Amino acid sequence: MAAPALSWRLPLLILLLPLATSWASAAVNGTSQFTCFYNSRANISCVWSQDGALQDTSCQVHAWPDRRRWNQTCELLPVSQASWACNLILGAPDSQKLTTVDIVTLRVLCREGVRWRVMAIQDFKPFENLRLMAPISLQVVHVETHRCNISWEISQASHYFERHLEFEARTLSPGHTWEEAPLLTLKQKQEWICLETLTPDTQYEFQVRVKPLQGEFTTWSPWSQPLAFRTKPAALGKDTIPWLGHLLVGLSGAFGFIILVYLLINCRNTGPWLKKVLKCNTPDPSKFFSQLSSEHGGDVQKWLSSPFPSSSFSPGGLAPEISPLEVLERDKVTQLLLQQDKVPEPASLSSNHSLTSCFTNQGYFFFHLPDALEIEACQVYFTYDPYSEEDPDEGVAGAPTGSSPQPLQPLSGEDDAYCTFPSRDDLLLFSPSLLGGPSPPSTAPGGSGAGEERMPPSLQERVPRDWDPQPLGPPTPGVPDLVDFQPPPELVLREAGEEVPDAGPREGVSFPWSRPPGQGEFRALNARLPLNTDAYLSLQELQGQDPTHLV
């Protein structure tokens, strides 16, 4: 019965044996610590510590890279009661055996009888666990009583980070320990240091270590071998404080400079003497500008001063006043046109009266400077009729029965000079188109009556309403009312197809400014003028009417 029972239990024990071995290995790894560092060239140093390690057991570290064909093994040597260490030599000291992409599998193997037992395992990334070799070749370059210059070298450092290094140094003074020594940090690759504030004739020791800036688990290298040096003794009778002499020299120079400047400013005889010393040859401006020198007595400042007061150049002054635009009815007296101080009365726009205006832009050409060029005011005259278009029959029948508009009285005094009409010759020069009509207008004696100048309704119906009037010309000072230059009634009747008798021998030819217009002429003019609701004439419109004369 015992044999059958053992037969089915044996396969079960074989299956459970690997599991028991892995549990034992995990227990061993849980109480051990395995740490390795790469020196960036061809050396991997490892330290393994184990609690309750077996006595008289040999252990070793085996390295197996994933991208290389070689493998290396080193014997762990005891460094303390529970720790061992070894160095994996991968090749020549300065050869680059590993790169940043390599991963090395490290195992700690211990012998148990005739078999090797795995005690620890690690996937090692060389450039994430860097520790360089300690600096070498420390030497004193220069030593004085209070300072010392020391240099060193770095061995077996990879070219991957040879420019990305930092250093720490410490100096051991008498009566202190290395742990108490202050650390001096160099954040760049600087293989020398200048120690200051040292005591003369004193013995010191110096150490330095290095660390690359690359790697997550990178650590400082071991401290270098101590370098002992001694400062020079101080000379007899010499001040032991070096900065005091420099301070005295600086203060003496500053006081001397201040005294020299004071003497140069306050000494009256310094000017000619200084010119002779500096050999300054300044020319006399009076030799070249004799007229200015005689006018201002040799004062150069008056030569360069402005002839105008400073207020003339002030941008904050009052702006020049601009002449107002006045619009008055034709029936108003002329004196109201030039009263600038008073506000003009609003014109009552009706369908029976035309309006006239006089605009002057004298204010635009006013200057404050005494030598400025004065420009004479330019006057612009224009008319407009704001009434709406009426029926010709109703217009004739509804003509005002009152007296005809009386001509305005001529101006006098300053007002007459302000807004006057041009002379006959100037008017012809200003608007030569007055002579370019089909024939000069003719007037009959007694033309002032309204009934004599009025046309029959039958003739008024035949007159075209969109007839374009001739260019306007300003009247003479004797007749200030502005009347458009129009063809005579005979010409209008001929165009309408009616027979009109020729003028008698007593009917002379005259221009429209030679007689006062009648009421019928105003009505005929108003009936022919197109509706114009604009109250202003621009400069371009004036030039368009008469391009030979520019305003």
Swiss-Prot record:
The record places domain Fibronectin type-III at 134-234
- Give the matching InterPro entries: FN3_dom (IPR003961), FN3_sf (IPR036116), Hempt_rcpt_S_F1_CS (IPR003531), Ig-like_fold (IPR013783), IL2RB_N1 (IPR040951)
Listed GO molecular functions? coreceptor activity; cytokine receptor activity; interleukin-15 receptor activity; interleukin-2 binding; interleukin-2 receptor activity
Which cysteines pair up through disulfides? They are 36-46, 59-110, 74-86
Task: Show which residues sit on the Extracellular side of the membrane.
Answer: 27-240
**Motif mapping: Box 1 motif:** 278-286
Motif WSXWS motif: where? Answer: 220-224
Provide the protein's localization: Cell membrane
Indicate the segments annotated as coiled coil, or none if absent. none
Q: How is the protein disposed in the membrane?
A: Single-pass type I membrane protein
Q: Keywords for this entry?
A: Cell membrane, Disease variant, Disulfide bond, Glycoprotein, Host-virus interaction, Membrane, Receptor, Signal, Transmembrane, Transmembrane helix
The signal peptide stretch is 1-26
Q: Can you quote a single GO CC term?
A: plasma membrane
Transmembrane segment boundaries: 241-265
Q: Which PANTHER family match?
A: CYTOKINE RECEPTOR, INTERLEUKIN-2 RECEPTOR SUBUNIT BETA
On assembly, the entry states: Non-covalent dimer of an alpha and a beta subunit. IL2R exists in 3 different forms: a high affinity dimer, an intermediate affinity monomer (beta subunit), and a low affinity monomer (alpha subunit). The high and intermediate affinity forms also associate with a gamma subunit. Interacts with SHB upon interleukin stimulation. (Microbial infection) Interacts with HTLV-1 accessory protein p12I.
**Associated pathology:** Immunodeficiency 63 with lymphoproliferation and autoimmunity: An autosomal recessive disorder characterized by immune dysregulation resulting in lymphoid proliferation, dermatitis, enteropathy, autoantibodies, hypergammaglobulinemia, and immunodeficiency with recurrent infections. Patients show increased susceptibility to viral infections, particularly cytomegalovirus disease.
Q: What is this protein called?
A: Interleukin-2 receptor subunit beta
Instruction: Give the source lineage, highest ranks first.
Output: Eukaryota, Metazoa, Chordata, Craniata, Vertebrata
What gene is this protein a product of? IL2RB
